[in-house]
Amino acid sequence: MKKIMFWITLIVGITVVFGSCSSSEDTTTTSSTSLPGYAATTLSGKIGTDWTFKTGRMVVPSSSSGSYSYDMTNDNLSNACSSSYTGTSSNPSVYFSRDAAPEAGEHELSFTSGNVKTVAFYDGTTIYIIAKGKITIDTVTTTAVTGKMYAISGSDTDHEINGTFTLSRCCIDNSTYSLCSE
């Protein structure tokens, strides 16, 4: 009987010790880099020259295996869906694509094995692959995608943009892209 009491006491004692040593901590995911907050103004900054977002689109792929492409320019294009987005030194463009449909949330840009989320700045001669920054999608509707972006080429403030955007959501219709209606 003494042996049974000894083992019960030992087990209860160990349980109490380990129970009192455990801790419950709230953990949050934070960025390993320190990025500034989003500007509350229209997406703007510099891409070699002063740049302010004016026209943009998010193209829905025509097949389930395609990717969603995002195009932005500081040029006033008459039709965001059917216009050509060609970057020039005076009208640079911003491009990126994702395999998944856009949904609300923030994504940090990165260029690591298994996690490539970049943005490209194109100034008519050079494509700058941007892996420092973040993009937040706020809303996705049938016809539009709204969000915020901060992106910088390393520490080069001559290639840095920050602010809000609204993109037309474009779908293919009779071999041409037009505003989605689905």
What residue spans do the PLM features occupy?
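A short, structured loop/turn motif at beta-sheet edges
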Residues: 136-145, 156, 169
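Polar/acidic, low-complexity leader/linker segments enriched in S/T/G and N/D
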Residues: 31-54, 60
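Edge beta-strand at a domain terminus
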Residues: 149-182
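Surface-exposed helix/loop patches within compact recognition domains
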Residues: 57-139
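A short hydrophobic beta-strand element
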Residues: 21, 141-151
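Residues at beta-strand starts and edge strands
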Residues: 41, 66-68, 143-145, 159-161
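Sec-dependent bacterial lipoprotein signal peptides
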Residues: 1-20
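Bacterial Sec-dependent N-terminal signal peptides
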Residues: 15-42, 175-182
